[in-house]
C-alpha cells in the first residue's frame, strides 16, 4: 500500500538538518577523504612550483606537435594503421545491438505496468547474458591476438638465437679441426725426429759411402729401396700440394702436373714454385686475420706499443724472422748432440769436406790474436777434445731448439686441457703435468737478494786426483828468530858472509898476538 501525502510531508518536515551518519561505516568517508587528499596534493604541488619561472614551449616540442613533422624526423616513431575489428573482433557489432535494444525499450514503454515490469525483468536477464557473451568473446579475441604476437616474437628470437649458435658452433668446429690438424702434423714431426738424428750419422762423402757399401752388400740394396721410397713420398707430397692449392684458389703454375714422375732436381724446382705461389696467399691470410684480431683486442689503438714486435702484424713478424737466413741456417748446423758421421775424421784429414774447411778458416782468421796460448779446438765443456771442432757442422741438420719449442707448446696445451678435465687418460695427463711442473720449476733462492746472503758455488771434487800431504815441514831457528824479531820491530842480520869475515878477522888478530915474541907470564 502506498504512502499517503501527509506521511511524506511529515517525513520531510521532521528531517534533521545534519544527517545521522554511522561512524563505523568506512564507505561513508571515502569520497570525503579522497577529495581532501586531492585538495591537499594539489596545494602541495602549487607550493612546490610557486618559485618556477614561466617558460614557453620548446622548439623541439613545437616541431613534434604535428604528425607530419614527426614522420619527417624519423620513421621509427610512426605506427601502423589498423581497424577496431582487427583488434576487438565482434565488439563493433555490439554498438548496433545496443541501439536496437534501446529502440525496443522506447516502443514498449507504452505497454501496461505489469507487462512492462515482466518485460523489463526478461530484458535485463537477456541483456546481462548478451553482455557476458560479448565480454567473453572480446576477451578471447584479444587473447588470441596477443598469443599470435607473442608466438611471432618468440619465433623471431629463437631464429636469431639459433643463427648465433650455429655461427658459434661452426667457428668452434673449425677451431677444433685446425687444432686436430696441427696435432697430427706435430705427431708426424715427433716420429720423424729419430729418423733425422739417425740420418746425421750417415756418411758425408761418396768415398765413405763406397767404403761402407763394400763392407756389406746388403747396404746397397737397402739404400736403393730407401731412395725409391723417399722419392715416391716427395712426389706424393708435391701432388697433394698442387691439389690443395688448386682447390683453395691459389694460383699455381700450369707447368706443374700431378701425374709427372720427377727426379731430385724436378722435386726441388716444383717445391720452389709452390712455395713462391703460397707466399702471396700466406701474406694475404695473415694480414686479414691479424687485422681482425688486433681490432677486436684493441691493441692497435695503443700508440705507445704499436712499434713493438708483438703488436706488429703476423706477416711482418714472419718476414722479420726469415730475413736473416744465414743465421737461421747456422742454427740448424749446431751439433747439439755431438753427432759424428761415419768416417768423418778420415774425410776431414784427406780434405774432402770443403764446407767444413771454409767455415773453420773464417773462424781462425777472426780469432787469430785472441787466446793464442789456448788451442783452437779446445772446449772445456766437452769430455773429449778431439783435433776436429764439431760444435758447428754444416753437414748435419739439427733443429732441436725449434723442436723443443713445439714440445713445450704441446705440453702446455695438454696441461691446460688436463686441468679442465678434457683428457681421456688420467695417467697421460698426470705425466704431462709432472713434466710441465719440472720444466717450470726454478731453483732460485729468494733470500739471496740485496746482499742478505753470500752467494757461493761448491767446486766439484776432481776425479782420480790426490793432493800431496805435507810431511811435517818445520821452520828453522833462523826463520823463527826473524819472525819474532819482525813482530817486535827489530832487525836481525842473518848474512853468513859478514859473519865469516868477522870470524876470520878475529882469528888473524889472535895469531898476530901469539907471534909478537913477547911472552907474559902470570
UniProtKB/Swiss-Prot annotation:
Keywords on record: Coiled coil, Nucleus
Entry keyword Zinc-finger: no
Coiled coil: 205-282
Annotated stretches, region: Disordered: 26-145, 356-385, 496-522
Annotated compartments: Nucleus, Nucleolus
Ranges of Acidic residues composition bias in the record: 100-110, 118-133, 496-511
Matching InterPro entries: AATF, AATF/Bfr2, AATF_C
Superkingdom, natural source: Eukaryota
Tagged with keyword Magnesium: no
Compositional bias (Basic and acidic residues): 26-35, 58-75, 376-385, 512-522
Listed GO CC annotations: nucleolus; small-subunit processome
Single GO BP term: maturation of SSU-rRNA from tricistronic rRNA transcript (SSU-rRNA, 5.8S rRNA, LSU-rRNA)
Main location: nucleus
Family per record: Belongs to the AATF family.
Protein name stated in the entry: Protein BFR2
Originating organism: Candida glabrata (strain ATCC 2001 / BCRC 20586 / JCM 3761 / NBRC 0622 / NRRL Y-65 / CBS 138) (Yeast)
Gene name tied to this protein: BFR2
Amino acid at each position: 500500500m502506498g504512502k499517503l501525502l501527509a506521511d511524506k510531508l511529515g517525513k520531510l518536515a521532521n528531517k534533521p538538518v545534519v544527517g545521522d551518519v554511522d561512524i563505523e561505516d568506512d564507505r561513508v568517508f571515502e569520497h570525503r577523504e579522497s577529495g581532501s587528499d586531492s585538495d591537499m596534493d594539489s596545494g602541495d604541488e602549487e607550493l612546490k612550483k610557486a618559485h618556477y619561472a614561466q617558460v614557453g614551449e620548446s622548439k623541439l616540442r613545437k616541431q613534434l606537435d604535428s604528425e607530419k613533422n614527426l614522420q619527417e624526423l624519423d620513421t621509427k616513431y610512426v605506427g601502423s594503421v589498423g581497424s577496431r575489428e582487427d583488434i576487438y573482433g565482434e565488439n563493433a557489432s555490439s554498438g548496433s545491438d545496443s541501439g536496437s535494444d534501446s529502440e525496443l525499450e522506447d516502443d514498449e514503454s507504452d505497454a501496461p505496468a505489469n507487462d512492462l515490469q515482466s518485460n523489463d525483468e526478461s530484458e535485463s536477464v537477456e541483456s546481462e547474458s548478451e553482455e557476458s557473451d560479448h565480454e567473453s568473446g572480446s576477451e578471447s579475441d584479444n587473447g588470441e591476438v596477443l598469443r599470435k604476437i607473442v608466438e611471432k616474437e618468440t619465433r623471431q628470437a629463437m631464429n636469431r638465437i639459433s643463427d648465433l649458435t650455429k655461427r658459434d658452433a661452426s667457428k668452434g668446429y673449425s677451431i677444433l679441426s685446425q687444432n686436430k690438424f696441427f696435432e697430427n702434423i706435430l705427431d708426424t714431426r715427433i716420429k720423424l725426429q729419430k729418423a733425422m738424428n739417425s740420418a746425421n750419422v750417415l756418411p758425408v762423402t761418396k768415398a765413405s759411402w763406397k767404403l761402407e757399401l763394400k763392407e756389406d752388400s746388403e747396404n746397397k740394396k737397402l739404400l736403393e729401396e730407401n731412395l725409391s721410397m723417399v722419392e715416391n713420398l716427395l712426389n706424393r707430397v708435391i701432388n697433394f700440394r698442387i691439389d690443395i692449392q688448386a682447390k683453395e684458389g691459389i694460383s699455381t703454375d700450369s707447368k706443374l702436373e700431378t701425374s709427372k714422375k720427377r727426379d731430385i732436381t724436378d722435386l726441388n724446382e716444383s717445391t720452389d714454385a709452390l712455395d713462391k705461389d703460397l707466399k702471396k696467399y700466406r701474406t694475404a691470410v695473415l694480414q686479414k686475420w691479424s687485422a681482425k684480431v688486433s681490432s677486436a683486442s684493441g691493441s692497435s689503438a695503443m700508440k705507445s706499443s704499436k712499434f713493438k714486435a708483438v703488436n706488429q702484424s703476423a706477416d711482418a713478424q714472419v718476414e722479420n724472422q726469415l730475413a736473416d737466413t744465414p743465421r737461421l741456417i747456422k742454427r740448424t748446423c749446431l751439433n747439439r748432440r755431438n753427432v759424428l758421421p761415419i768416417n768423418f775424421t778420415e774425410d776431414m784429414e784427406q780434405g774432402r769436406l770443403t764446407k767444413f774447411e771454409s767455415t773453420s778458416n773464417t773462424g781462425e782468421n777472426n780469432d787469430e790474436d785472441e787466446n793464442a796460448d789456448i788451442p783452437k779446438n779446445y772446449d772445456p765443456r766437452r769430455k773429449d777434445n778431439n783435433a776436429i771442432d764439431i760444435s758447428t757442422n754444416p753437414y748435419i741438420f739439427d733443429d732441436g731448439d725449434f723442436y723443443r719449442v713445439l714440445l713445450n707448446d704441446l705440453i702446455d696445451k695438454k696441461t691446460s686441457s688436463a686441468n679442465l678435465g678434457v683428457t681421456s687418460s688420467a695417467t697421460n695427463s698426470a705425466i704431462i703435468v709432472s713434466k710441465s711442473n719440472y720444466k717450470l720449476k726454478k731453483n732460485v733462492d729468494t733470500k739471496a737478494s740485496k746482499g742478505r746472503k753470500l752467494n757461493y758455488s761448491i767446486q766439484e771434487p776432481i776425479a782420480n786426483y790426490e793432493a800431496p800431504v805435507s810431511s811435517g815441514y818445520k821452520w828453522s831457528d833462523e826463520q823463527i828468530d826473524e819472525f819474532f824479531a819482525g813482530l817486535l820491530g827489530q832487525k836481525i842480520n842473518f848474512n853468513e858472509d859478514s859473519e865469516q869475515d868477522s870470524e876470520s878477522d878475529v882469528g888473524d888478530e889472535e895469531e898476530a898476538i901469539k907471534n909478537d915474541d913477547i911472552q907474559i907470564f902470570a
